[in-house]
Amino acid sequence: METTNKANTMMAELKTLCNKDNIVLSLSQYEKLVGYALLLEDWNNKINLISRKEDAPILIKHVFHSLLIGLFHQFSSSEKVLDLGTGGGLPGIPLAIAWPDTQFLLVDATGKKIAACQSMIKSLDIKNAVAVHSRVEELKGMSFDTVLSRQVAQLEQLCSYASKILKPGGRLICLKGGNLDHEIKKALAGKKEKGSFPSVVEQFPVSGYSPCFTEKHIVIAR
């Protein structure tokens, strides 16, 4: 009963946030997103997937935060998406739930984290996401329209990884925090030196969507 009440409260909160920002989801998608938040919380008690010193609910700080990417990039049915360094499935699993016609590959170099992702994907019956224990260097012969990352790595390094596996015209989308001016400058300088990706880097502040997202940005490199 307690779990049911908690899930109902979480769903009502998520619906309020999504409706406010015109994020359209079905009842089944809401149920899966709340289910994922509960599973992530449970798994995080076993292995360290996200910080255990959370200052905000997982549903907002991690799940809703991931969904905001869809306000700045519309995923398509023909799109192949890589979630690089997915950790506990972020942002890949929430986005796979919200865009069931888009294919998502989640990779991480830590086997325990991928095992958790695989279990959650199976429990939630998500058909369009696959989690693989791998490093980006091992994804030989694969290419993607979009690369996602929530890693703390510098943007220049993430751009370097993405440039090797992005299709022409592809983009890297990152969830990052703090003042990014120096990171963006370095990433663009790296392009000038090496003659490669990215040509343009845009940053979109998301602090207006929740007090939890102070100094948070969605960064899109093309």
Swiss-Prot record:
Keywords linked to the UniProt accession: Cytoplasm, Methyltransferase, rRNA processing, S-adenosyl-L-methionine, Transferase
Known EC number: 2.1.1.-
UniProt xrefs under InterPro entries: rRNA_ssu_MeTfrase_G, SAM-dependent_MTases_sf
Entries under CDD domains matching the protein: AdoMet_MTases
Binding site for S-adenosyl-L-methionine: G85, L90, D108, A109, T110, V136, E137, R150
Domain of life: Bacteria
Gene Ontology cellular-component annotations: cytosol
Enzyme class, UniProt record, top EC level: transferase
Localization per record: Cytoplasm
Entries under Pfam families matching the protein: GidB
Classification via SUPFAM superfamilies: S-adenosyl-L-methionine-dependent methyltransferases
GO MF terms, alphabetically ordered: rRNA (guanine-N7-)-methyltransferase activity
Entry function: Specifically methylates the N7 position of a guanine in 16S rRNA.
Family from the record: Belongs to the methyltransferase superfamily. RNA methyltransferase RsmG family.
PANTHER family the record matches: S-ADENOSYL-L-METHIONINE-DEPENDENT METHYLTRANSFERASES SUPERFAMILY PROTEIN
Name of the protein this chain belongs to: Ribosomal RNA small subunit methyltransferase G
